[in-house]
């Protein structure tokens, strides 16, 4: 009986701690608006680099924004030419025309990184010389 009472108290406090921690973590992430991230970004891997323009113009799908750039370079980087993007609380997702994700870029201190199962890594950085990003 003593063990059961102790176990129930322990389980209660663990559940309480996780609910407090989980609630504060979720509330600390903010979804940026497209206007905060729009502009020309530099996309690169180990072999190639190209400029990508993230716009705040919505695509017909409704929840993604238009993306423009050199189609040959974009097809090389993503395996197909992406059509759009959407912000997330911890990064941004490059999408096809229907909104399916092609790559997720996590916002890290040294840039925005997408890592793929085959070992490839892409990096995006805002182009600081572009007036849209200032």
Swiss-Prot record:
GO terms for molecular function: metalloendopeptidase inhibitor activity. Pfam families: Inh. GO terms for cellular component: periplasmic space. Keywords: Disulfide bond, Metalloenzyme inhibitor, Metalloprotease inhibitor, Periplasm, Protease inhibitor, Signal. SUPFAM superfamilies: beta-Barrel protease inhibitors. Its main location: periplasm. It is found in: Periplasm. The keyword Signal applies. Disulfide bonds join 50-73. Residues 1-26 form the signal peptide. Inhibitor of the alkaline protease. Belongs to the protease inhibitor I38 family. This is Alkaline proteinase inhibitor. It comes from Photorhabdus luminescens.
């Amino acid at each position: 009986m003593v063990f059961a009472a102790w176990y129930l108290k322990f389980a209660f406090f663990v559940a309480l701690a996780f609910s407090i921690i989980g609630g504060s973590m979720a509330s600390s992430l903010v979804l940026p608006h497209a206007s905060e991230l729009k502009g020309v970004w530099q996309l690169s891997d180990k072999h190639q680099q190209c400029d990508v323009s993230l716009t705040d113009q919505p695509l017909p799908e409704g929840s993604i924004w238009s993306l423009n750039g050199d189609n040959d370079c974009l097809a090389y980087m993503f395996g197909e030419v992406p059509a759009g993007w959407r912000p997330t609380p911890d990064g941004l997702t490059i999408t096809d025309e229907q909104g399916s994700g092609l790559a997720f870029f996590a916002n890290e201190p040294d840039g925005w990184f997408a890592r793929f199962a085959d070992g490839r890594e892409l990096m995006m950085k805002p182009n600081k010389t572009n007036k849209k990003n200032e």
